[in-house]
Amino acid sequence: MQFNIPTLLTLFRVILIPFFVLVFYLPVTWSPFAAALIFCVAAVTDWFDGFLARRWNQSTRFGAFLDPVADKVLVAIAMVLVTEHYHSWWVTLPAATMIAREIIISALREWMAELGKRSSVAVSWIGKVKTTAQMVALAWLLWRPNIWVEYAGIALFFVAAVLTLWSMLQYLSAARADLLDQ
């Protein structure tokens, strides 16, 4: 296995995850800002590793596997942390919706790949918008410098949940013929 800069960025994102969790729970006033900063750095590497892999023609099978895994683990852990912090339905409901969608679509992609139809459920533009809304909302909910940022984060978290459902319906619609084929 050959390591290149895009793959190393993805590995760096994975390595940041335990530090992100530890910093989140530090009993100091700067903990929310530091946790949000670590999350943002990790989120930027998610965009940057894919960009560099395509730009430098350094895509690898290992990188293609690890990138979505690192992304989903980072986001799921961030959702668990903000859900635990807020301990209210208005954060838990969108988080549960987004986590459920990721499980459903991951299973759908795997199944479609077995059928040789992976491109039928490739990432769409709405998925990219959803991811952006999700990352920004999570960063705001982690940072929470004031009540207005928290309200904006919760509102954007709901927007991300709606986009999550929309993109899931698009993926299921694209795979409908195969899903219903007996």
Swiss-Prot record:
Q: Which GO terms describe its biological process?
A: glycerophospholipid biosynthetic process; phosphatidylglycerol biosynthetic process
Keyword Manganese included in the entry's annotation: no
Q: Please give the residue ranges for the topological domain Cytoplasmic.
A: 2-13, 83-87, 170-182
- InterPro entries recorded for this chain? CDP-alcohol_PTase-I (IPR050324), CDP-OH_P_trans (IPR000462), CDP-OH_PTrfase_TM_dom (IPR043130), CDP_ALCOHOL_P_TRANSF_CS (IPR048254), PGP_synthase_bac (IPR023762), Phosphatidylglycerol_P_synth (IPR004570)
Question: Primary place of residence?
Answer: membrane
Reactions the enzyme catalyzes: a CDP-1,2-diacyl-sn-glycerol + sn-glycerol 3-phosphate = a 1,2-diacyl-sn-glycero-3-phospho-(1'-sn-glycero-3'-phosphate) + CMP + H(+)
Coiled-coil annotated residue ranges, if any: none
- What does the UniProt entry say about where the protein is found? Cell inner membrane
Keywords of the record, alphabetical order, are: Cell inner membrane, Cell membrane, Lipid biosynthesis, Lipid metabolism, Membrane, Phospholipid biosynthesis, Phospholipid metabolism, Transferase, Transmembrane, Transmembrane helix
* Spans traversing the lipid bilayer: 14-38, 62-82, 88-108, 147-169
Q: Which Pfam families match?
A: CDP-OH_P_transf
Topology in the lipid bilayer is annotated as: Multi-pass membrane protein
Q: Please give an example of a GO cellular component term from this record.
A: plasma membrane
Q: Periplasmic side: which ranges?
A: 39-61, 109-146
Q: Which domain of life is it from?
A: Bacteria
Q: What is its EC number?
A: 2.7.8.5
GO terms of molecular function: CDP-diacylglycerol-glycerol-3-phosphate 3-phosphatidyltransferase activity
> What does the PTM comment of the record read?
The N-terminus is probably blocked.
The kind of enzyme this is, by top-level EC class, is transferase
The pathway where this protein functions is: Phospholipid metabolism; phosphatidylglycerol biosynthesis; phosphatidylglycerol from CDP-diacylglycerol: step 1/2
Role description: Catalyzes the conversion of cytidine diphosphate diacylglycerol (CDP-DG) and glycerol 3-phosphate into phosphatidylglycerol. Essential for the synthesis of anionic phospholipids, thereby playing a role in balancing the ratio of zwitterionic and anionic phospholipids, which is thought to be important for normal membrane function.
The entry assigns this protein to a family as follows: Belongs to the CDP-alcohol phosphatidyltransferase class-I family.
Descriptive protein name:
CDP-diacylglycerol--glycerol-3-phosphate 3-phosphatidyltransferase
**Organism of origin:** Escherichia coli (strain K12)
Q: Name the lineage.
A: Bacteria, Pseudomonadati, Pseudomonadota, Gammaproteobacteria, Enterobacterales
